[in-house]
Amino acid sequence: MKLDGYTRLAAVVANPIKHSISPFIHNRAFEATATNGAYVAWEIEASDLAETVANIRRYQMFGINLSMPYKEQVIPYLDKLSDEARLIGAVNTVVNENGNLIGYNTDGKGFFKCLPSFTISGKKMTLLGAGGAAKSILAQAILDGVSQISVFVRSVSMEKTRPYLDKLQEQTGFKVDLCALEYVSELQARIAESDLLVNATSVGMDGQSSPVPENIVLPETLLVADIIYQPFETPFLKWARSQGNPAVNGLGMLLYQAAEAFQLWTGKEMPTEEIWQSLTEKYQ
């Protein structure tokens, strides 16, 4: 990697963040595209967020990525938000356009780009969970022309989830159906008519649990996706593959959301195939 007086910085800002694989992805991309850039991880306290954002301008950085807990907290310090960031109410990428700081959310785009030979336009989706990742997938699906979305959460989370879906409907005119995960017959009915089933919960990270009962029958053509990438194959994906369904883990989402950010910063396409090879070797 070339480092000199012209090197521009990008960083991921969160707490904790030292475990992040974003520096691995972006520094590979800078090198592969002959871009004079360097990408680092900044673990900061909330009291340092305003100063950190000011440093994007001060040091003429490409921009920053954000992870928890700063995706929402960063918004007041930005000049403008993209459509999807406004809908989601969270930013994972800040782009420095000649001193104007623009907030984007590339998670949803990254998710749909990682799905093999699949477009969401005109399709039906069942989504498990309603956290940050789920919101970005939801908003992007609506922007991309999805025809129906069924969101399943635990019954104790229904009340907390509804206001966001109501706000989404106000902003887009699109009504998302909210259902309780405990109603297995409803879950089966919605999955039976879906083209895409997504686990956007953390259930399965332990390598043992699954977000849905194993007696659910999947339609043959259903594509199944999990946002988890460690373990590389969750029990949920293993179960889907055992029924003969195509299944995708969350590593592709991580790579393609990074590729979207990289393009916004540099105007260049990230060599995703080359980096995917390195990532799978690292995490499989």
Swiss-Prot record:
Positions bound to shikimate = 20-22, 67, 92, 107, 229
* Pathway this chain belongs to: Metabolic intermediate biosynthesis; chorismate biosynthesis; chorismate from D-erythrose 4-phosphate and phosphoenolpyruvate: step 4/7
Classify the source by domain of life.
Bacteria
Top EC class for this record? oxidoreductase
Family annotation (Pfam families): SDH_C, Shikimate_dh_N
Q: Which reaction does it catalyse?
A: shikimate + NADP(+) = 3-dehydroshikimate + NADPH + H(+)
Coiled-coil intervals:
none
Which biological processes are named by the entry's GO terms? Answer: amino acid biosynthetic process; aromatic amino acid family biosynthetic process; chorismate biosynthetic process; shikimate metabolic process
Catalytic residues as annotated in Swiss-Prot or TrEMBL: 71 (proton acceptor)
Asked whether the keyword Cell wall biogenesis/degradation is assigned, the reply is no
Cross-referenced CDD domains, in alphabetical order? NAD_bind_Shikimate_DH (cd01065)
Task: Enumerate the residues binding NADP(+).
Answer: 83, 129-133, 227, 250
Q: Which residues form the signal peptide?
A: none
Q: What is its EC number?
A: 1.1.1.25
Task: List keywords of the entry alphabetically.
Answer: Amino-acid biosynthesis, Aromatic amino acid biosynthesis, NADP, Oxidoreductase
Xref: InterPro entries? Aminoacid_DH-like_N_sf, NAD(P)-bd_dom_sf, SDH_C, Shikimate_DH, Shikimate_DH-bd_N, Shikimate_DH_fam
Q: How does it assemble?
A: Homodimer.
Briefly state the protein's biological role. Involved in the biosynthesis of the chorismate, which leads to the biosynthesis of aromatic amino acids. Catalyzes the reversible NADPH linked reduction of 3-dehydroshikimate (DHSA) to yield shikimate (SA).
Q: Family assignment?
A: Belongs to the shikimate dehydrogenase family.
NCBIfam families annotated for this entry? Answer: aroE (TIGR00507), PRK00258.2-4 (NF001315)
Which HAMAP family has this protein been placed in? Answer: Shikimate_DH_AroE (MF_00222)
Could you tell me what this protein is called?
Answer: Shikimate dehydrogenase (NADP(+))
Organism this protein belongs to? Streptococcus pneumoniae serotype 19F (strain G54)
- Which gene holds the coding sequence for this protein? aroE
